[in-house]
């Protein structure tokens, strides 16, 4: 399953071409919409402070809670089918953070600091 955004989609198609595993677009894997913070540097103090407000939609964006809801719902669906298949999710750092929080308890600080490198492979078992 892959995000509809170009880099993730290209990566998933490459993986599919090499492995023969079918790839399918999953709209819920799209990165969080950061509203007024979209296309701004992620390391800035103002952005870091804004991320502490989990219920804030960043003036037209998507709150952390809404993001978690859509990813948790997707993971619940995958879990229901996990006896049948193994899934590869190709997505973004914000999505990886939510997936990590689905499988492991995290403090707010751990959640905010969590990240994976581009094309990293992380395995989770239900």
For the regions a protein language model found, what residue spans apply to each?
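Phosphate-coordination/substrate-recognition cap region in phosphate-metabolizing enzymes
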Residues: 1-48
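Short beta-strand scaffold positions
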Residues: 2-3, 69, 90-91
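Short glycine/proline- and acidic residue-enriched helix-loop micro-motifs
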Residues: 47-66
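Active-site-adjacent alpha-helix immediately C-terminal to a catalytic or transition-state-stabilizing loop
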Residues: 9, 72-126
């Amino acid at each position: 399953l892959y995000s509809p955004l170009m880099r993730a989609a290209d990566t998933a198609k490459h993986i599919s071409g090499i492995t023969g595993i079918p790839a399918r677009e999953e709209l819920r894997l799209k990165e969080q919409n950061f509203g007024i913070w979209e296309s701004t540097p992620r390391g800035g103090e103002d952005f870091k402070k804004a991320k502490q407000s989990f219920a804030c939609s960043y003036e037209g964006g998507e709150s952390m809670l809404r993001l978690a809801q859509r990813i948790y719902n997707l993971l619940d669906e995958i879990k229901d089918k996990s006896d049948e298949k193994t899934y590869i999710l190709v997505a973004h750092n914000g999505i990886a953070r939510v997936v990590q929080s689905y499988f492991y308890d995290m403090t707010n600080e751990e959640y905010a600091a969590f990240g994976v490198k581009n094309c990293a492979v992380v395995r989770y078992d239900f």
